[in-house]
């Protein structure tokens, strides 16, 4: 592991905007912020928007700057990647931006039913290998999971046209699966 990666992991632990639940918390599905993100983390009741697979978090930060009336949470498993967005959000004093470091498989352990208003899947790994198609962030099992914490009428916004075309007709539990973008 490179020394920059170790330094970034250590620095992430000092950023208020980085949330890193332990494996036991998410595995048991009782994460402390579940159902309490607005009250306990953001301190407001604004709509929550997730960016899944946020990578370096630049898009999450840009959304937070453009829409200060919403709360944004970038989600990625790679802490060294999240560092860039977390550092920018911290330096800019952004109170409406957070980063959640967890595996997508455990994300429903972190959010209560109806807690999330919108989900952005902007630049996901396409998982081109036939054996890994089920790992796509837009695979049916993930869409079903997102529906559990997406509010009624909430939207999933793919950030690229090929996936948008594929998702256009999907309805899941009364949720609008795709916004017109």
What are these regions (language model features)?
Residues 1-50, 58-65, 86-113:
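S-adenosyl-L-methionine
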Residues 52, 75:
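Conserved beta-strand/loop positions that form the S-adenosyl-L-methionine
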Residues 55:
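Conserved glycine-rich SAM-binding loop
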Residues 78:
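Conserved SAM/SAH-binding beta-strand->alpha-helix loop
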Residues 109-118, 123:
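A short acidic, Gly/Pro-enriched loop at the edge of an enzyme's catalytic core
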Residues 138-152:
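A short glycine-rich, Lys/Arg-flanked "PGG" loop and its adjoining helix->strand segment in the class I
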Residues 152-159:
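Conserved beta-strand signature within the Rossmann-like core of class I S-adenosyl-L-methionine
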């Amino acid at each position: 592991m490179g020394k920059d990666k170790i330094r970034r992991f250590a620095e992430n632990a000092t950023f208020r905007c980085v949330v890193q639940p332990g494996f036991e918390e998410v595995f048991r599905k009782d994460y402390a912020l579940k159902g309490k993100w607005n009250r306990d983390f953001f301190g407001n009741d604004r709509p929550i928007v997730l960016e899944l697979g946020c990578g370096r978090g630049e898009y999450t930060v840009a959304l937070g700057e453009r829409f200060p009336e919403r709360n944004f949470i970038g989600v990625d498993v790679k802490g060294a990647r999240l560092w860039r967005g977390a550092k920018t959000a911290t330096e800019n004093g952004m109170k409406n931006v957070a980063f959640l470091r967890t595996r997508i498989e455990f994300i429903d352990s972190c959010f209560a039913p109806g807690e999330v208003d919108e989900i952005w899947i902007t630049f996901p790994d396409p998982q081109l290998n036939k054996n890994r198609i089920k790992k796509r962030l837009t695979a049916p099992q993930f869409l079903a999971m997102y529906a559990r914490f997406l509010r009624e009428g909430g939207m999933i916004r793919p950030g690229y046209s090929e996936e948008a075309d594929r998702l256009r007709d999907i309805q899941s539990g009364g949720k609008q699966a795709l916004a017109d973008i």
